[in-house]
Amino acid sequence: MTAIRYEFIKTCKQTGARLGRVHTPHGSFDTPTFMPVGTLATVKTMSPEELKAMDSGIILSNTYHLWLRPGHEIIREAGGLHKFMNWDRAILTDSGGFQVFSLSDFRRIEEEGVHFRNHLNGDKLFLSPEKAMEIQNALGSDIMMAFDECPPFPATFEYMKKSVERTSRWAERCLKAHERPQDQGLFGIVQGGEFEELRRQSAKDLVSMDFPGYAVGGLSVGEPKDIMNRVLEFTTPLLPDNKPRYLMGVGSPDSLIDGAIRGIDMFDCVLPTRIARNGTCMTSEGRLVVKNAKFARDFGPLDPNCDCYTCKNYSRAYIRHLMKCDETFGIRLTSYHNLHFLLNLMEQVRQAIREDRLGDFREEFFEQYGFNKPNAKNF
């Protein structure tokens, strides 16, 4: 019995998006879904109870950051990440690869792994497929990710080809080193940049290894949205229908809908909590920056069409006041709202798939949110 099982429910006749359910050792969640990011074993400013109140079935934590602080051995001693952070639903941990490539000024890639400097204190560190598995096995997440190379955008075909080949070899080493396949599902990560030939090669390599799920990596790294959509169009059909598909690092509302239309089941991104900290809110009528002076006497909710805790209880004027005074409660309220907005958006996406009208929903949402306007903002 594998730790992770994907249950297919139906396909949207209008778009081909799929409705499903992922079963894990810590419960099930419906897909397509958005996963809030709890980098350091906490979704910034949110309690586990609040995440449950907004119906989050799975969150993401970060292997690299937890390895550095507090250390995976301490989390193992605590009884694993679920106990450590008091979260009894599913957890996905990334492999640490993206952080090694994005945070460290100094890094040297070898066949064995990656040498780099700790971004906190400059110490020399080494992360390999085996080490990434050891850390994630200690954390005890339900879904763990293979250690991959995260190439920059843009990269040459030659560089990307070598990178894909290395990522495939590393994936094989991850499978061998993974010590808890019965209660932790390991996902392979398809790379290859914008090159269809390399995506095909990467998918073929990984599918032959029979992972319980697959991620599409190397997107949302600065490439235009049309390139991301094009890559998804030729990549997701290469992945098995009976396994979950995860698009890493994507969280803007338009990309969530467009990803679901292209067959993606799972998404994660720090976007909702990151922008909340500077007062930027996603609403049914588009982006709203609550710090702006025009909201000083606005006693209506952030979003008149939202029924979240923030919108039911607090006004734009009050939240603006908190943000201007650097009060933590202001960040909690905007973070709660943004997370609720995306989780609720995914429920609307699932309902549209049930009704075979996701294409129509996309048009309506884009029109209302303002994505169809010239110079539309990303979120």
Swiss-Prot record:
Binding site for Zn(2+): C306, C308, C311, H337
Cofactor note: Binds 1 zinc ion per subunit.
Keywords, sorted A to Z: Glycosyltransferase, Metal-binding, Queuosine biosynthesis, Transferase, tRNA processing, Zinc
Protein's UniProt keywords contain Zinc: yes
Entry GO terms, CC: cytosol
Annotated signal peptide: none
Cofactor list: Zn(2+)
A GO molecular-function annotation: metal ion binding
Active site: D94 (proton acceptor), D268 (nucleophile)
Catalysed reactions, as listed in the record: 7-aminomethyl-7-carbaguanine + guanosine(34) in tRNA = 7-aminomethyl-7-carbaguanosine(34) in tRNA + guanine
Superkingdom of the organism of origin: Bacteria
Stretches the record annotates as RNA binding: 249-255, 273-277
Any GO BP annotation: tRNA-guanine transglycosylation
Pathway note: tRNA modification; tRNA-queuosine biosynthesis
Pfam families on file: TGT
Enzyme nomenclature, EC number: 2.4.2.29
InterPro entries: ArchSynthase1/Queuine_TRR, TGT, TGT-like_sf, tRNA_ribo_trans-like
SUPFAM superfamilies hit by this protein: tRNA-guanine transglycosylase
Oligomeric and partner information: Homodimer. Within each dimer, one monomer is responsible for RNA recognition and catalysis, while the other monomer binds to the replacement base PreQ1.
Family, per entry: Belongs to the queuine tRNA-ribosyltransferase family.
Function: Catalyzes the base-exchange of a guanine (G) residue with the queuine precursor 7-aminomethyl-7-deazaguanine (PreQ1) at position 34 (anticodon wobble position) in tRNAs with GU(N) anticodons (tRNA-Asp, -Asn, -His and -Tyr). Catalysis occurs through a double-displacement mechanism. The nucleophile active site attacks the C1' of nucleotide 34 to detach the guanine base from the RNA, forming a covalent enzyme-RNA intermediate. The proton acceptor active site deprotonates the incoming PreQ1, allowing a nucleophilic attack on the C1' of the ribose to form the product.
The name this protein goes by in its record: Queuine tRNA-ribosyltransferase
Organism (species): Bacillus anthracis
Gene: tgt
